[in-house]
Amino acid sequence: MSLQLGDEAPNFVAETTEGKIDFHEWIGDGWAVLFSHPKDFTPVCTTELGYVAGLKPEFDQRNCKLIGLSVDSVDDHKEWSKDIEETQGNAVNYPLIGDTDLQIAKTYGMIHPNVSGTAKERTAVDNATVRSVFVIGPDKKIKLMLVYPMSTGRNFDELLRVLDSLQLTAKHKVATPANWKRGEKVIIVPAVSDDDAKKQFPEGWESPKPYIRMVPEPKD
């Protein structure tokens, strides 16, 4: 069965560049981003992992951990990390999972479950579907899933924007409009009646249509 938004993120125990982890225990009571890449020592992936390393302080501020995954070995990850730091200017400062038996990739739907063989037998093209992103909440449920083609590097700034939205809407009964950024107006969700909205937003709201109710971003 394929994973859906709202499903519990499958737990696993795995070897990483920072030692063995139990995924759910590693997440703890915060947020996590699990992102995978098709192959070590490839150009697009090199730029991605270097860039996200530079953004780690931004994720830390949001109580969100980062963890990478590919079907390469932990030893390969460590060697490749030297190239990433040399070429991208940022040292990899988060763990990378070595999923050499393909089990995590299969569990998360990155590789067909009936695929046989080992990671050593697979090329980057074989692993083309292993360029996924999962945002996981403190309840260990999947909040966002993205799959990118091999030829397109991911926009991790957009991932921060989405994380801001997810964290805000987890606390308040609002949704965020197109291209929303922190500090901009948000939308009262339809499930909140006008009577309840008056209690939660006593200063009122802008309403160009009855079903569109805009308010300033709630403060924690």
Region locations from a protein language model:
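Chalcogenol-based redox active-site neighborhoods
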Residues: M1-D220
